[in-house]
Design a protein with these regions (language model features):
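N-terminal glycine-rich FAD/FM-binding segment characteristic of electron-transfer flavoproteins
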Residues: 1-281
Length: 281
C-alpha cells in the first residue's frame, strides 16, 4: 500500500444513534497508517457527524439525502459509488455488521475493487482473518485499492483516539436518483421480540453446561442483574432451551466485545471463544 494513502471509514447508525462497531472500525483505521476520513450517510445526520468529529481523523464527510433516510442496499451503493469516486481512498473500512454484509459485496462489484471480509487485524500490507470457525487465522495480502470489513470486537471502541480539536465536517456533493432504489425500506430485521444486541453490551454474564442444572440459571441471572449486565450463554444452553437463541455467543451466535465478560461453567471451546475474543482481559 502507499504510505499515507487515505482510508475511508463508513459509519453505521440507526435512529440517530451511532453503532459502537463504527468506533471499533475507526480504531482499526487509526492503526493502519491513515490519514482517515469518516463518511456518514443518511438524512438529518448532523448530530452523528458531530459525534464522530471527536475522533482523531482528517475529516468527517457527510452525504445527506432524503433518499437515504431509511437504509436500502441500493441507496448505499449509489451514494458510496459516487463518494469513493470523488474521494479516491485507497482503502474503505466498514464494520462487519448485518448491514455492511448486505451492501458491501454489491458495492465492491460496482466499483470493481476486492473485498476482504471479517478481518480481525491490520497486518503489514494486508489483514488477518479467521478461517474454519476460528481454528486458523490467515494472512491476506491485497494489492491496490480495496474494501475491508472488521469483525465486531476485533478492535476496542474505547481504543479510538480522540483529536485535540474536532475534525472538520464537510458535505459531499453526491446526488442520488431515488428512482434507482429498487428496495422498499422495511423495519430492521429481528429474530424475535425479545432479541437483544449483545454486541453493544458493556458487561456480560455468560453460562455454559457446567452450571449443571436449569435451576442454577437463576443465580447467574441475579448476578447479571446486580452487575447491570446482559445474560448470555454458550450453544448447549440455548440448544436445551434454557435461554433463547438470541442470547448465544460464539461462531453460530453473536460476537461481543464487552468491558467485562464473566463466564460461568463454560469449557472454552473454540466455537465459543471466537465470539468473545474482543472482551477486555
Amino acid at each position: 500500500r502507499s504510505e499515507g494513502a487515505v482510508i475511508l471509514v463508513i459509519a453505521e447508525h440507526r435512529d440517530g444513534k451511532l453503532n459502537r462497531a463504527t468506533l471499533e472500525t475507526v480504531a482499526a483505521a487509526q492503526t493502519a497508517g491513515g490519514p482517515e476520513k469518516i463518511a456518514v450517510l443518511g438524512s438529518g445526520v448532523d448530530a452523528v457527524a458531530a459525534e464522530l468529529a471527536a475522533a482523531d481523523a482528517a475529516e468527517v464527510v457527510v452525504v445527506d439525502d432524503p433518499a437515504l433516510e431509511d437504509y436500502t442496499a441500493d441507496g448505499m451503493v449509489l451514494a458510496l459509488e459516487q463518494l469513493i469516486a470523488a474521494e479516491q481512498p485507497e482503502r474503505v473500512f466498514l464494520p462487519h455488521t448485518y448491514q455492511a454484509r448486505d451492501f458491501a459485496p454489491a458495492l465492491a462489484a460496482r466499483i470493481n475493487r476486492p473485498l476482504v471480509t471479517d478481518c480481525v487485524a491490520v497486518k503489514d500490507s494486508g489483514y488477518v482473518r479467521p478461517m474454519f470457525q476460528g481454528k486458523l487465522q490467515a494472512d491476506i495480502a491485497v494489492d491496490g485499492p480495496h474494501l475491508a470489513t472488521f469483525q465486531i470486537g476485533s478492535y476496542r471502541a474505547d481504543a479510538m483516539k480522540s483529536g485535540a480539536t474536532p475534525a472538520p465536517v464537510r458535505k459531499a456533493a453526491v446526488a442520488i436518483d431515488a428512482a434507482k432504489i429498487r428496495q422498499k425500506p422495511e423495519a430492521p430485521f429481528k429474530e424475535a421480540k425479545q432479541a437483544v444486541d449483545l454486541s453493544q453490551a458493556e458487561r456480560i454474564v455468560s453460562v455454559g453446561r457446567g452450571i449443571k442444572a436449569q435451576e442454577h440459571l437463576q443465580l447467574a441471572e441475579q448476578l447479571a442483574q446486580a452487575m447491570g449486565a446482559e445474560i448470555a450463554a454458550s450453544r448447549p444452553i440455548c440448544d436445551a432451551g434454557w435461554l433463547p437463541m438470541d442470547r448465544q455467543i460464539g461462531s453460530s451466535g453473536q460476537t461481543v466485545a464487552p468491558k467485562l465478560y464473566v463466564a460461568l461453567g463454560i469449557s472454552g471451546a473454540i466455537q465459543h471463544r471466537v465470539g468473545m475474543l474482543g472482551a477486555r482481559p
